[in-house]
């Protein structure tokens, strides 16, 4: 009798372990299958979170004084792992404005500097001393080549830009209008 109970307990433990392992493998499989979709959802959510409409003029002024990384060589490629890692670090990013190209349906936050996380969710300034509305205003971001609607995320819409389109930048004080005069492919 006691031998049957012992076997029954061992079987229950074994079944529980198998069920936990199977559940883990199913979750891992789903994460791998929906890898780019998960990345895209996080990117869209954070891009919306940092839109210029979500930030006050005072926050923008304060963020303009923040230090930023302007080393273009330190920028890493966009990957799902990097986006997930950045999501878990939950930092407050220095929004200093917004960029919009209505014909391309592009609307992104502008962050100070070229930190990788900045470029995952919007555009980053390339030079520390540039001033919005004065001459050229250099920005960088990523282009995405895979996933649903990849051509509509970050700087990917710029592949469809044409001469004569207008780019609008704002720091919530003024709106600056730039015209695209040359597109190099």
Enumerate the predicted regions with their spans.
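N-terminal Lys/Arg-rich, disordered targeting/topogenic segments
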Residues: 1-15
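Solvent-exposed, non-transmembrane regions of membrane-associated and secreted proteins
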Residues: 12-185
